[in-house]
Every structure is written in C-alpha cells, then in structure tokens.
Amino acid sequence: GLLSVLGSVAKHVLPHVVPVIAEKL
C-alpha cells in the first residue's frame, strides 16, 4: 500500500538526510 511505499522511500532517504541534519546541529 501507500504506507509501504512511503516506508521504503524513508529507509532510502533517511540515511542521507540524517547526516545533513546532524551537521547543521
């Protein structure tokens, strides 16, 4: 379902987004 797709996208995006946020903090 849609949630499954969003979950898959999140798993691919988060590893890239988290380090960027960490650098800004």
From Swiss-Prot:
Species assigned in the record: Litoria rothii
Function: Antibacterial peptide with wide spectrum of activity.
GO biological process, one term: defense response to Gram-positive bacterium
Keyword terms of this UniProt record: Amidation, Amphibian defense peptide, Antibiotic, Antimicrobial, Secreted
GO CC annotation terms, alphabetical: extracellular region
Localization (cell): Secreted
Cysteine disulfide partners in this protein: none
Domain of life, source organism: Eukaryota
InterPro entries: Caerin_1
Annotated family: Belongs to the frog skin active peptide (FSAP) family. Caerin subfamily.
Name of the protein this chain belongs to: Caerin-1.10
Leucine amide: residues carrying this PTM: L25
Keyword Chloroplast recorded: no
